[in-house]
Regions:
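Basic, low-complexity intrinsically disordered segments
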Residues: 1-359
Length: 359
């Protein structure tokens, strides 16, 4: 966790999304789902600052280790780009899940991603005569023994606080001798420790769009949102509709949903989606071929899952490179989320009038 590393396929393009970013790099303000070019830009900024502060104004070497960089200001910050190996990650994920099954019944485990699970340990602590921290530590130690992989854990009185304890607190504390980081939160400690925490995007389910709306209304922290819910709740519902209810709950550290309820949930409707990041700007003819291929794959996905649909949605986001080709683009230009000028994204919806899974 002290290594500056991102998981991304650098052979594709610098616009590729990083599937993971280590805490060492996140500490410099790099997001967990940054694009590779963002990481490069931020590292260049960091190194410009390090060079100014280095003895003699120059580097004598480079390192990707956080502790070594902290001890040696004359070193340039490097980062490792590791190519994704999803088949291997899934295999190891299954191995780790099976270790958890030695302690926990499957109905009390909710796999959140390939490297993250929620566990409801409520009814196991008395059985094992352990505290929540001891129980988490025992499972992590078993995983380390069997796989050589250490872990970070968040413990909370609900699923939201577990996630926040891990994302914001555990990943930023000093590890023990085995590299393990464990943090705990309840509703009161959450308010005491994190109501003033910034940025808002560090919190689960608060993306750039939510943060931008909140900050435009002078709400910069979870404490601000909680106070607003007492004084001007209507504004939050006006901004976010029914989703304001969840935002308010989270601002106070509440989360009523449990693993049992997640597993019992049966959605009335389903949706499927697919997306592609192209290597370079495509002309209309080539882009149309890609869209048709995606439509074919979506159809096969519907058939495989036994689903039908009566609505299709297509979104196209254009790259800044489209503005570099001799002024051929004549449409509207907007700023993207990185502050760069780019053609305005396109959005279209088609209502079929009947349900179908056919092309």
């Amino acid at each position: 966790l002290t290594t500056n590393l991102v998981v991304a396929d650098s052979e594709r393009t610098e616009k590729t999304i990083c599937l993971a970013v280590t805490p060492a790099l996140k500490a410099y303000g790099i997001g967990g789902r940054a694009r590779l070019f963002e990481v490069v830009q931020r590292v260049n900024e960091i190194n410009a600052d390090r060079r100014r502060k280095a003895p003699g104004g120059k580097f004598t070497g480079a390192s990707s280790d956080k502790k070594e960089l902290e001890a040696h200001p004359e070193l340039e910050l490097e980062f490792i780009t590791a190519k994704p190996r999803m088949a291997l990650y899934k295999k190891i994920s299954v191995e780790i899940y099976n270790i958890y099954l030695k302690y926990i019944a499957p109905e009390d485990i909710y796999p959140y991603s390939v490297d993250e699970v929620f566990i409801d340990a409520t009814h196991y602590l008395d059985t094992y005569k352990m505290s929540a921290r001891e129980f988490a530590g025992a499972m992590i130690a078993d995983v380390l023994k069997e796989t050589g992989i250490t872990a970070t854990a968040g413990i909370g009185t609900n699923m939201y606080l577990c996630k926040i304890a891990m994302d914001i607190m555990a990943k930023h504390i000093e590890p023990d001798k085995n590299g393990v980081r464990i943090a705990e939160l309840d509703e009161m400690s959450y308010r005491r420790l994190l109501w003033q925490h910034r940025p808002l995007t560090d919190f689960w389910r608060v993306g750039q769009g939510y943060a931008k709306k909140l900050e435009a209304n002078a709400l910069y922290t979870m404490g601000d949102i909680a106070r607003c819910s007492l004084e001007n709740e209507e504004m939050l519902y006006r901004l976010f509709g029914v989703n304001a209810e969840l935002l308010i709950d989270h601002a106070w550290g509440y989360e009523p949903c449990t693993i049992a309820e997640i597993k019992a949930y049966k959605p009335e409707n389903s949706s499927t989606s697919s997306g592609q990041v192209l290597q370079s700007p495509y002309p209309y003819e080539k882009a149309l071929i890609v869209i048709k291929e995606m439509a074919e794959l979506s159809t096969l996905d519907l058939v495989e899952k036994g689903l039908v649909t009566d609505q299709l949605v297509l979104d196209i986001v254009y790259d800044v490179e489209n503005l570099k080709y001799g002024g051929k683009y004549g449409g509207e230009i907007v700023s993207d989320r990185y502050g760069r000028l780019a053609p305005k994204p396109a959005h279209g919806t088609a209502n079929l009038g009947r349900y179908s899974s056919s092309t």
